């Protein structure tokens, strides 16, 4: 399937096709996120805390 976009990838593993933790705060976690955490910033936002495959980069739509 299509990989979810991540503007700011944090820690990534060192494999050839790296899995990363996405630092983005989003209105809802992408389908397939295994560890979705609610982050309260005044409005409820979510962050996926599991290592997943992403398209990383600042211009990702």
Curated annotation (Swiss-Prot):
<keyword id="KW-0646">Protease inhibitor</keyword>
<feature type="disulfide bond">
    <location>
        <begin position="33"/>
        <end position="48"/>
    </location>
</feature>
<feature type="site" description="Reactive bond for trypsin">
    <location>
        <begin position="14"/>
        <end position="15"/>
    </location>
</feature>
<dbReference type="GO" id="GO:0010951">
    <property type="term" value="P:negative regulation of endopeptidase activity"/>
</dbReference>
<dbReference type="InterPro" id="IPR000877">
    <property type="entry name" value="Prot_inh_BBI"/>
</dbReference>
<feature type="disulfide bond">
    <location>
        <begin position="12"/>
        <end position="20"/>
    </location>
</feature>
<feature type="disulfide bond">
    <location>
        <begin position="5"/>
        <end position="60"/>
    </location>
</feature>
<protein>
    <recommendedName>
        <fullName>Bowman-Birk type proteinase inhibitor B6</fullName>
    </recommendedName>
</protein>
<dbReference type="Pfam" id="PF00228">
    <property type="entry name" value="Bowman-Birk_leg"/>
</dbReference>
<keyword id="KW-1015">Disulfide bond</keyword>
<dbReference type="GO" id="GO:0004867">
    <property type="term" value="F:serine-type endopeptidase inhibitor activity"/>
</dbReference>
<feature type="disulfide bond">
    <location>
        <begin position="6"/>
        <end position="22"/>
    </location>
</feature>
<feature type="disulfide bond">
    <location>
        <begin position="29"/>
        <end position="36"/>
    </location>
</feature>
<keyword id="KW-0722">Serine protease inhibitor</keyword>
<comment type="similarity">
    <text>Belongs to the Bowman-Birk serine protease inhibitor family.</text>
</comment>
<dbReference type="InterPro" id="IPR035995">
    <property type="entry name" value="Bowman-Birk_prot_inh"/>
</dbReference>
<dbReference type="GO" id="GO:0005576">
    <property type="term" value="C:extracellular region"/>
</dbReference>
<comment type="function">
    <text>Serine protease inhibitor. Inhibits trypsin (Ki = 30 nM) and weakly inhibits chymotrypsin (Ki = 550 nM). Does not inhibit bacterial subtilisin.</text>
</comment>
<feature type="disulfide bond">
    <location>
        <begin position="9"/>
        <end position="56"/>
    </location>
</feature>
């Amino acid at each position: 399937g299509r990989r979810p976009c991540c503007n700011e990838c944090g820690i990534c593993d060192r494999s050839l096709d790296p899995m990363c933790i996405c630092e983005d705060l989003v209105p809802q976690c992408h389908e397939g996120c295994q560890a979705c955490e609610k982050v309260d910033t005044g409005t409820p936002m979510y962050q996926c805390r599991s290592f997943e495959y992403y398209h990383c980069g600042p211009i990702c739509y």
